[in-house]
């Protein structure tokens, strides 16, 4: 009977890597986000920074899954580039410093946070990972002029998010 009960469960793709030397490895997860603890953890984490990105936690996770990215990566980059969306060019919704290389001071403007998350996620997949970047440090040399420093800061926020535990009752997920 247990087998019959398990047949209807959603499947998940999880790629594991050996533990040694994986501090900056890009891990991929694909899970249904409707009841996903990652969404709740990210939402609480962003709220702890009073981030305008808080309401888009589900978008971060869904776009990460869609593009086979570590679900923490795009949020961590926003932490480095804009203090999680709090310091951006007015009206740009560009919390990632995306497109600053174009010569404009404020880079690309997105219509909203969701569009920014989607475009940055897809861009990281196509322009970094699909072109051989295997970890945040590989990405850093393409993404930022100060590659290793940038990557270390992104890694810091990935690690903080990974270990984050909501402590306020309002931040704890409740299931009935």
Language-model segments: residues:
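Export/targeting segments at the very N-terminus of extracytoplasmic proteins
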Residues: 27-74, 161
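A short structural micro-motif
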Residues: 66, 83-84, 145-146
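Charged, low-complexity, helix/coiled-coil-prone segments
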Residues: 17-25, 55-69, 96-104, 139-143, ...
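Alpha-helix N-cap and coil->helix boundary residues
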Residues: 55-56, 72-73, 93, 131-134
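Extended, non-globular alpha-helical segments
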Residues: 2-39, 45
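Short, charge-rich amphipathic segments
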Residues: 10-15, 43-62, 84-94
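Peptidoglycan-targeting cell-wall enzymes and recognition modules
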Residues: 30-46, 79-133
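Non-catalytic cell-wall polysaccharide-engagement segments
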Residues: 1-19, 103-176
């Amino acid at each position: 009977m247990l087998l019959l009960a398990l047949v209807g469960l959603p499947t998940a793709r999880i790629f594991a890597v050996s533990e040694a030397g994986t501090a900056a490895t890009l891990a991929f997860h694909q899970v249904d986000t409707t009841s996903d603890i990652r969404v709740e953890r990210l939402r609480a984490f962003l709220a702890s920074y009073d981030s305008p990105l808080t309401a888009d936690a589900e978008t971060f996770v869904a776009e990460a899954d869609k593009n086979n990215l570590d679900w923490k990566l795009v949020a961590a980059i926003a932490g480095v580039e804009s203090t999680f969306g709090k310091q951006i060019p007015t009206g740009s919704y560009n919390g990632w410093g995306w497109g600053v290389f174009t010569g404009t001071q404020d880079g690309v403007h997105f219509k909203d946070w969701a569009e920014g998350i989607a475009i940055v996620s897809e861009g990281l997949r196509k322009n970094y990972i699909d072109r051989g970047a295997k970890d945040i440090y590989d990405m850093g040399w393409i993404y930022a002029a100060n590659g290793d420093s940038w990557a270390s800061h992104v890694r810091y926020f990935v690690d903080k998010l990974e270990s984050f535990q909501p402590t306020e009752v309002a931040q704890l997920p409740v299931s009935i």
